């Protein structure tokens, strides 16, 4: 069964073969929110992230690209409900700025992602363009947005 939220996925429990890719986001805002979730989740339990997600969404300006791209990490860290990890918060701001650049170049993030032929190439590009994204995070993100790193 396809899923919307990453924590619904058995992939998160290392059972990759039993989980279909997630649903493709409808908006760039959703693409950024899912990337942010994958980054914020690293090192935390899914249960904790699931419980805290409404607070994180509010603290991080609903992951609206323009607002987050113009925020400062210091200001976000002071907001109620924000995760208190300065490196992750700085990555959220930098990644929103990168989304802005990609949208200026390609119109939408989805259109940009479609220009990358293979899932493996997409994984590499995500690691190069975005902060706090390593191989596992890139692979998991692609899975969550409906694309497999194993696509030809």
Each model region followed by its residue ranges:
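N-terminal polyanion-binding entry modules of DNA glycosylases/AP lyases
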Residues: 1-82
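Alpha-helical ds-nucleic-acid-binding substructure associated with the helix-hairpin-helix region
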Residues: 59-129
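Phosphate-backbone recognition surface of nucleic-acid-processing proteins
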Residues: 123-127, 131, 140-152
């Amino acid at each position: 069964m396809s899923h919307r939220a990453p924590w619904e996925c058995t992939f998160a429990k290392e059972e990759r073969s039993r989980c279909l890719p997630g649903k493709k986001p409808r908006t760039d805002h959703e693409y950024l929110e899912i990337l942010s979730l994958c980054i914020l989740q690293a090192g935390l339990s899914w249960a904790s992230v699931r419980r805290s997600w409404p607070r994180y969404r509010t603290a991080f300006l609903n992951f609206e690209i323009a607002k987050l791209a113009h925020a400062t990490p210091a200001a976000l860290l002071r907001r109620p409900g924000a995760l208190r990890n300065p490196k992750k918060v700085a990555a959220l701001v930098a990644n929103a700025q990168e989304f802005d650049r990609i949208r200026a170049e390609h119109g939408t993030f989805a259109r940009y992602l479609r220009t990358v032929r293979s899932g493996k190439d997409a994984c590499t590009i995500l690691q190069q363009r975005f902060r706090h994204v390593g191989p596992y995070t890139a692979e998991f993100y692609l899975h969550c947005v409906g694309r497999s790193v194993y696509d030809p």
